[in-house]
């Protein structure tokens, strides 16, 4: 009986340590090794905050990265995604498209999909559009620590996905704080355990909420 209890305790401890460690590792690894070395059908700019049509620092960095790899002929089309927050006069997608066109990308090469204020909804929206066009290879321009979750969702919906992390702004690998890594690891765990089962998890949970979620998951 004592041996059984010890084994159960050992298993619980292993789960408590292994699951969060795995999530942290895959999130960190995707950030360090994004794997953008082949061409794609489209570049997707993950939505982020804008103010009266002007991209915020995070969105601007993602747009700059998308423009950079578009200029290097990685893909013939850029897709901007993202709805607006309540009270906004425009959307993340529209602000992104406007910036790209204003900075030299032809209008015909930028598609705006003003849907979703979270990664899952945005992913569904652009995958639906890509399927209509009979294409499935995508490069996601986003923050380094967001790469793993964004890629995972895209692959779950049938895309061949890679990520090109922002090279500037507050969320580069060098500038990001560990709490962003922890938050993304927690959000990834929430997605693979609940999101894949149709239970929607908001991107806008606080770090504290995610920590409580991970604690409940592994206990």
PLM regions with names:
Residues 2-35:
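N-terminal type II signal-anchor transmembrane helix
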Residues 13-14, 69, 129, 190:
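Enrichment for repetitive, rod-forming helical segments
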Residues 24-182:
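A structural signal for short, hydrophobic/glycine-enriched beta-strand patches
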Residues 86-92, 147, 184-192, 207-214:
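A general structural signal for short secondary-structure boundary/capping elements
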Residues 177-204:
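A transmembrane-helix-recognition feature enriched in membrane-embedded lipid enzymes
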Residues 199-219:
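Short linear elements at protein peripheries
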